Amino acid sequence: MQSLHGNCLIAYARHKYILTMVNGEYRYFNGGDLVFADASQIRVDKCVENFVLVSRDTLSLFLPMLKEEALNLHAHKKVSSLLVHHCSRDIPVFQEVAQLSQNKNLRYAEMLRKRALIFALLSVFLEDDHFIPLLLNVLQPNMRTRVCTVINNNIAHEWTLARIASELLMSPSLLKKKLREEETSYSQLLTECRMQRALQLIVIHGFSIKRVAVSCGYHSVSYFIYVFRNYYGMTPTEYQERSAQGLPNRDSAASIVAQGNFYGTDCSAEGIRL
């Protein structure tokens, strides 16, 4: 038997199916049941094609894509380690995700497709009140992740330490202390989030510099250019030109995609129709 730790598991029962918990308990499922579970609480010894292991890194990329109001980032009471959603129809994409998950040498496009399909499967559980608490219990996100989640859900907002602390249900002094323990600050994270978003809008979406500045919360275009140059070592226009010429930049668009910094993307199960 293989015990899985530090990840989550999505299992799909095409027929009657049994999962064994680490405490020896058996959980029985009917055909059409889609299961989301804390992988550290599950033992898997057969039917590998029936489950997809979702890594902590992938889950961490899914979290910031959720709407701010959906996240209760304070301490949660103990929640179930397993959730079930019964699907009225077959899930044709599940087999593809399972096959991609077994392949250790995915091409770049396949990696992105696998991630997108996993996000779609995860979104099936969004209406379950226990999903977010379970997700957070597994991830136990650090303060950096929590702050970035708040910022990225409204990147253009005039964020202050007090406002972010309010969203996280804590005092500004406590937030400042926790960020200091992680060797960062709210202002540093605000700049990082805005600069990553700016790069996406410039390189991938082709926005004008003025539009990028406004979209990222900068009222002054000249100040935005100043911050961008300090962060990336060149102006936004220079970055655009180098990208158009195929010259290497310090942070390429491809690397940003690989890191998953697409916080503005909507995630839904539209198209799966479960």
From Swiss-Prot:
UniProt cross-references to SMART domains, sorted A to Z: HTH_ARAC
Coiled coil ranges: none
GO molecular function: DNA-binding transcription factor activity; transcription cis-regulatory region binding
A GO-annotated cellular component: cytosol
One Pfam family matching this protein: HTH_18
Swiss-Prot/TrEMBL induction comment: Expression can be activated by RpoS and repressed by CRP, H-NS and GadW, depending on the conditions.
Ranges annotated as DNA-binding: 162-183, 209-232
InterPro entries linked: Homeodomain-like_sf, HTH_AraC, HTH_AraC-typ_CS, Tscrpt_reg_AraC-type_HTH
Location of the HTH araC/xylS-type domain: 145-242
Keyword terms of this UniProt record: Activator, DNA-binding, Repressor, Transcription, Transcription regulation
PANTHER family noted in UniProt: HTH-TYPE TRANSCRIPTIONAL REGULATOR GADX
Its biological purpose: Positively regulates the expression of about fifteen genes involved in acid resistance such as gadA, gadB and gadC. Depending on the conditions (growth phase and medium), can repress gadW.
Self-association and partners: Homodimer.
Protein name in the entry: HTH-type transcriptional regulator GadX
Organism name: Escherichia coli O157:H7
UniProt lineage: Bacteria, Pseudomonadati, Pseudomonadota, Gammaproteobacteria, Enterobacterales
